[in-house]
Swiss-Prot record:
UniProt function note: Amidase; part of the gene cluster that mediates the biosynthesis of the yellow pigment chrysogine. Pyruvic acid and anthranilic acid are likely substrates for the nonribosomal peptide synthetase chry1/NRPS14, with pyruvic acid adenylated by the first A domain and anthranilic acid by the second. If pyruvic acid and anthranilic acid are merged and released from chry1/NRPS14 by hydrolysis, a subsequent amidation would lead to 2-pyruvoylaminobenzamide. This process is probably catalyzed by the amidotransferase chry2 using glutamine as amino donor.
Protein name, per record: Amidase chry2
PANTHER family: ASPARAGINE SYNTHETASE, ASPARAGINE SYNTHETASE (GLUTAMINE-HYDROLYZING)
One cellular component term from this protein's GO annotations in UniProt: cytosol
GO terms assigned for molecular function: asparagine synthase (glutamine-hydrolyzing) activity; ATP binding; hydrolase activity
All copies of domain Asparagine synthetase, residue ranges: 251-639
EC number of the protein: 3.-.-.-
InterPro entries (UniProt xref): Asn_synth_AEB, Asn_synthase, ASN_synthetase/amidase, AsnB_N, GATase_2_dom, Ntn_hydrolases_N, Rossmann-like_a/b/a_fold
Transmembrane segments: none
Catalytic machinery residues: 2 (nucleophile)
UniProt keyword terms in alphabetical order: ATP-binding, Glutamine amidotransferase, Hydrolase, Nucleotide-binding
Keyword Nucleotide-binding found: yes
């Protein structure tokens, strides 16, 4: 787990050698860009420049596999024509090293060395052979091409922009400040929320390398993104002939393997544990694997008691504390548990840093708890953790999936209820979720978009997250509807599958995986936050060998509705698969969203912090937020205890923090 920053003089501009003064400048710029992400890699730092200084690769290292200098980056091939910087963990690397040993000379034992070897062996198709959490930049001097790629689910972030004739690529946007970038708000992207769907960000001209994509830049061509992988789901009319026991065993085997390969490290490894089934099942499987003889990182003991779990302990009356359940799970497994206490003051003290390092606004406070977890783990000398992200999106853990799971029969599996019962349950689920906020479509909305929205409910659920009170002038960008932006952000193949092939719950899962998960959850509760304290997070539920199998599980085995007592059983097939590894309490417990505290009183620490940030001057300096509506949200959040108002005011405060720390110019209708 590391941080990368790179540049290439942009195609179409002069490729003549850089003069000495300019060469010194680009060296200093790259060095400063690494300073801005130095928290990601305290163990080593490396740089490489082409002879003409038109290309530069920089890397800061957190050493996890191969702690020796031979694992330092950038990596180079033996001929000196191919160079790469890699962030993340690549599994199955030993198999590839053995396979390619005759044609590539490996310098050390680092997993990331296989990137250049696979590229030389397979060409551009090599990315599909990578398994794990990764982002990288590779420069091929012979072909004069730069390749930047990101893992399938966006666990690792990777951004790019063009500034002063250079294509810049980095793990975090803040690195671009070193090259002189002066960020501006992309109000169009903010207003229609396209930054949640496509490659744009809320900064003008700054883009994401999308999950499952690679960026390529060649001489005399503009940089382009291409997909190398995407989610697939079965035809909703195809019968699944497997038994439930067979599918359960298939999930169990693949999840165990995904956990097992993530235990390998030359440093200590721990587990993040909450009260839910996702992290509990991971902890249970780690304990099981230790008993079976699998080493946990560099731990020599094969006793479960050597395993450490870390849990956030919110205030007991906050409605967010799961530490009691986590403690009972730890006792059941016979493992060590460390509780990290988080009261309101502790949350507030981390509010600004969580926003700055995540580089996204998310109207919840669980990211501050995640930052405290990483801090506690780091303090005890642990460099890697196993986490539970990605389970809800694939196994059907969100309430927002309920209506979609019932909007059509599941033709792939024997009926669990009559059609009348299904329709009644669907109507109730739709009402409970308060769908239908989409309103009337304007004549400009294509018929196909209307059809996709009315056959799927989850788009509006995602679009409601973190909505802002926009200033009137922003209407110059049109009265765009975020739900249409989301639907129309998918390519023609996906839209055709949504309309014709996929069950609605699979469409809902696709939308979450492509939008909310990479752009919110994995930034605010994942790598960006963990790496503030030099902790690598590994996500077995996002192992593509597992998810490709789970995506082919019938909807009825993911979300199960009991028409007799009108009850839901979320993640049914996961519960059955992990039953041997969790307590009866966790196995039987209903899904509860993992969120931070949601009620705060006037005059308390959060109210004071928000009041300090959300002033008239600060809001007006954003330029795109209405002050009167913001005042109304402040009143609703703290005086009236309105949940939607709290989320809105938190989002405004986060944008204030981002604007101040990035030095963003005030937005206006004049450009």
């Amino acid at each position: 787990m590391c941080g990368i920053s790179a540049f290439i003089t942009h195609p179409g501009h002069s490729r003549s050698p850089v003069l000495n003064g300019d060469a010194k400048q680009v060296v200093e710029e790259l060095e400063t860009s690494l300073d801005l992400i130095a928290h990601r890699g305290p163990d080593a730092r490396g740089r490489w420049f082409s002879d003409n200084h038109h290309v530069g690769l920089g890397h800061v290292r957190l050493s996890i596999i191969d702690l020796s200098p031979s694992g330092n980056q950038p990596f180079h091939d033996e001929q000196g024509g191919i160079h790469a910087v890699v962030n993340g963990e690549l599994y199955d690397y030993e198999r590839y090293k053995a396979q390619l040993a005759d044609e590539f000379k490996f310098v050390g034992n680092s997993d990331c060395e296989i990137v250049i070897a696979l590229y030389k062996h397979y060409g551009l198709s090599f990315i599909s052979h990578l398994r794990g959490e990764f982002a990288f930049v590779l420069w091929d001097e012979n072909r004069q091409q730069l390749i930047a790629a990101r893992d399938r689910y966006g666990i690792k972030s990777l951004y790019y922009t063009v500034h002063q004739n250079k294509l810049l690529v980095a793990t975090e946007i803040k690195s671009f400040l070193a090259f002189g970038l002066e960020p501006e708000w992309c109000v169009r992207s903010l207003r229609d929320q396209s930054w949640r769907v496509d490659s744009t960000t809320f900064f003008e001209g700054v883009y994401k390398v999308r999950p499952g994509h690679y960026l390529i830049c060649r001489p005399n061509e503009r940089e382009e993104q291409h997909p190398y992988w995407d989610l697939e789901y079965p035809d909703k009319f195809a019968k699944d002939l497997r038994s439930e026991d067979e599918i359960t065993e298939g999930v169990r085997e693949r999840l165990l393997e995904a956990v097992r390969i993530r235990l390998k490290a030359d440093v200590p490894v721990a587990v993040y544990l909450s009260g839910g089934i996702d992290s509990s099942s991971v902890a249970g499987m780690v304990s099981h694997l230790i008993k079976q003889g699998t080493k946990l990182g560099n731990e020599t003991s094969l006793l479960p008691s050597s395993m450490k779990c870390y849990t956030v302990q919110f205030d007991e009356g906050s409605g967010a504390d799961e530490s009691a359940i986590a403690r009972r799970t730890a006792d059941f497994l016979g493992v060590d548990i460390h509780l990290v206490k988080m009261d309101e003051e502790a949350l507030v003290s981390r509010f600004e840093d969580t926003t700055w390092y995540s580089e996204v606004p998310l109207p919840d406070l669980n990211g501050m708890g995640r930052l405290a977890l990483a801090e506690a783990v780091h303090a005890q000398g642990i460099k890697a953790v196993i986490t539970g992200e990605g389970s809800d999106e694939h196994f059907g853990g969100y309430d927002a999936f309920r209506a979609d799971s019932l909007s059509e029969p599941d033709h792939s599996w024997p009926a669990m209820m009559t059609d009348t019962e299904r329709q009644e349950a669907h109507a109730l689920a739709s009402k409970e979720a308060q769908y239908g906020i989409f309103g009337d479509f304007t004549p400009k909305v294509p018929i196909s978009t209307k059809r996709m929205f009315y056959s799927n409910h989850v788009a509006s659920s995602i679009a409601r997250v973190g909505s802002l009170p926009f200033s009137d002038w922003t209407k110059v960008y049109g009265n765009s509807i975020p739900e249409t932006t989301m639907i129309e952000g998918f390519d023609g193949r996906v839209r055709d599958n949504i309309l014709k092939r996929w069950h609605p719950v699979h469409t809902a899962q696709y939308m979450f995986v492509k939008t909310f998960m990479p752009h919110f959850i994995l930034r605010y509760n994942g790598d960006n936050i963990d790496m503030v304290h030099q902790v690598e997070s590994r996500c077995p539920f996002l192992d593509h060998h597992l998810t490709e199998y789970v995506n082919n599980v019938p909807p009825s085995l993911k979300m199960r509705y009991n028409a007799k007592d009108k009850s839901w059983r979320e993640k049914h097939i996961l519960r059955e698969a992990v039953k041997p590894f969790v307590t009866d309490e966790v196995y039987n417990m209903s899904k509860k969203a993992y969120m931070g505290p949601r009620k705060f009183w006037p005059g308390g620490p959060l109210h004071k912090k928000i009041s300090e940030l959300v002033t008239k001057a600060n809001v007006e300096n954003l330029g795109f937020v209405d002050w009167q509506a913001t005042q109304d949200a402040m009143d609703g959040a703290f005086n009236k205890q309105e949940g939607l108002a709290l989320r809105r005011i938190i989002t405004v405060a986060q944008f204030v923090v981002l604007g101040q720390r990035f030095g963003v110019k005030r937005a206006s209708g004049r450009r």
